[in-house]
C-alpha cells in the first residue's frame, strides 16, 4: 500500500520537495500552512477512515506489527494511538442496564461469571481475567485482571453494576473463592453438566480467537500490564456495543 505524503499539521497534500534532512530523508514544504516535514510514516496524516480501520483491526487477532504492515503506519504512531483508544474506553463498558421494576429484575436477571488464564511478558507471569456476563443480553457487565485469589473475586464483584449485585442470580463453576464473595442467595455453583456457564465460556473462546495477545502460544503477547488490560477493555466495550445494538429500544 502506497500512502501519499500529507502535511501532519493540516493534512494537505499540496506540498513540494524541499531538500533532505541531515539523515538523508526527503524533506517537504507544505504550500498551505508553510510547515516543513519529512516523509516518515509517523508524519503522514492519518484520516478518520484509516483510524476506524485500525480500530477494527485491533479486534481481529492481528499483531501490532501486522497492522503496521497492512495499513502503512509506523509502530511508534500505532503505539501512541492504541494508548489513546484504550484510555477512551468508559468504565461502564457500554453496558445497557435493564429497564423495569425490581419485581421484574429479581425473576429475570441471570448472570454468569468465570475466570480465564492469560500472561504478560512471560507465561510465569500469569494474569487471570475475571468476567461477568448478562446471560440474556450477552453483555459483559464487569471484568477484572489479577491473580486467581479471593481478592480478585471481590474486585470483580465490586465492578458488577449494582442492579445485578442486588437482583441477579449468578451461575459460576465450583471454584471455592466465589463462595462468600457472591451472596449465597444470589449464587448458584454448578457442574459442567449443568451447562449454566456456557455463554461466558463461549465468550472466553471469542477473546482468544479475536485478541492475538490472548492466544496461548503467541509471539504477540503483552509486554505491559496496562496495555494488556486496555486491549481487553477495548474489545469488551465494542463487543457490548454490538450486543446492545441488537436489543429492543
How does the language model describe each region?
Residues 1-249:
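Residue-level recognition of single "structural anchor" positions
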Amino acid at each position: 500500500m502506497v500512502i501519499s505524503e500529507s502535511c501532519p499539521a493540516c493534512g494537505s497534500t499540496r506540498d513540494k520537495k524541499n531538500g533532505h534532512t541531515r539523515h538523508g530523508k526527503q524533506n517537504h514544504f507544505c504550500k498551505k500552512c508553510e510547515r516543513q516535514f519529512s516523509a516518515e510514516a509517523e508524519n503522514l496524516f492519518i484520516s478518520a477512515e484509516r483510524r476506524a480501520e485500525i480500530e477494527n483491526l485491533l479486534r481481529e487477532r492481528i499483531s501490532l506489527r501486522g497492522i503496521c504492515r497492512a495499513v502503512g503506519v509506523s509502530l511508534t504512531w500505532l503505539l501512541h494511538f492504541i494508548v489513546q483508544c484504550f484510555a477512551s474506553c468508559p468504565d461502564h463498558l457500554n453496558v445497557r442496564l435493564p429497564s423495569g421494576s425490581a419485581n421484574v429484575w429479581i425473576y429475570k436477571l441471570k448472570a454468569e461469571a468465570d475466570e480465564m488464564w492469560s500472561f504478560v511478558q512471560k507465561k510465569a507471569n500469569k494474569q487471570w481475567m475475571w468476567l461477568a456476563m448478562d446471560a440474556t443480553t450477552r453483555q459483559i457487565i464487569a471484568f477484572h485482571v489479577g491473580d486467581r485469589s479471593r481478592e480478585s473475586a471481590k474486585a470483580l464483584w465490586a465492578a458488577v453494576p449494582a442492579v445485578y449485585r442486588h437482583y441477579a442470580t449468578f451461575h459460576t463453576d465450583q471454584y471455592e473463592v466465589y463462595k462468600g464473595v457472591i451472596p449465597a442467595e444470589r449464587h448458584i455453583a454448578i457442574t459442567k453438566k449443568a451447562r449454566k456457564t456456557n455463554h461466558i465460556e463461549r465468550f472466553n473462546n471469542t477473546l482468544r480467537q479475536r485478541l492475538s495477545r490472548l492466544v496461548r502460544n503467541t509471539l504477540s503477547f503483552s509486554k505491559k500490564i496496562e496495555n494488556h488490560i486496555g486491549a481487553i477493555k477495548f474489545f469488551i466495550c465494542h463487543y457490548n456495543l454490538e450486543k446492545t445494538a441488537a436489543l429492543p429500544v
